[in-house]
Amino acid sequence: MQTAQYIIELLKAVFLGIVEGITEWLPISSTGHLILVNEFLNLRQSKDFIDMFNIVIQLGAILAVMVIYFKRLNPFQPGKTAREVQLTWQLWLKVVIACIPSAFFGLLLDDWMEAHLSNFFVVAIMLVVYGIAFIWIEDRNRRVEPKVTDLARMSYKTAFYIGLFQVLSIIPGTSRSGATILGGIIVGTSRSVAADFTFFLAIPTMFGYSGLKAVKYFIDGNTLTGGQAAILLVASVTAFLVSLFVIRFLMNYIKKHDFTVFGKYRIVLGIIVLFYGAVKLIFG
């Protein structure tokens, strides 16, 4: 690949990292957006690499959670009281419990989902369906007080239920954060508790999923060139830096606002994607 072309590929990686850093945490589907953006940016790489790339760059976004919440998530943090250490371990146990459903169904259905549901029409439908769900749930939520307003008081059973909602995010266009935040609100948590738990749940979930994708990539006989590694690294670092801002933005945003605006965005985007997919199918 010529130098000019390679620089363009790196610039594309930066843009994709920005998209990942924004959409991983907002309930609007990061994978769905990456699939769409790749249509227009068209990374000059193999399909196997792009499929792996779309998942593995999420590690950069996940690292941002670990940096922002390091003290809260670290049971060995100096200065923590015995009670705080206990609560930290309990939090991690809740995260592990919530991971069980998606780990089971993810391993079972990942290949089938990728083969049959990674297309414009599925992404469009999921964008619209969950957009409507967010608007409806938030409208209902105005008349219902949340039962859980403190993550420390969230039960293990509630954590498991949220984990069941995370299974829905296996379908492209759903949004992992969208499914778990929506699930948290449905089972009675406040928006802030649902968002916090979504961030923490992302750590083992996305590390596991990214690792699975990377392993499959190499098992299928693919290799990673130095240029591809650089593209992956640039996108991941960009996703990390953007995520640092977006996570803080979202936590401040939900103190005064609900998720209705994201529901409306999903519906509009879903209609656009559906139209684009139809045009592409008809005219090629």
From Swiss-Prot:
It comes from Streptococcus thermophilus (strain ATCC BAA-491 / LMD-9). This is Undecaprenyl-diphosphatase. The keyword Calcium does not apply. Its main location: membrane. GO terms for cellular component: plasma membrane. Its EC number is 3.6.1.27. It is found in: Cell membrane. It is an enzyme of class 3 (hydrolase). Pfam families: BacA (PF02673). The keyword Membrane applies.
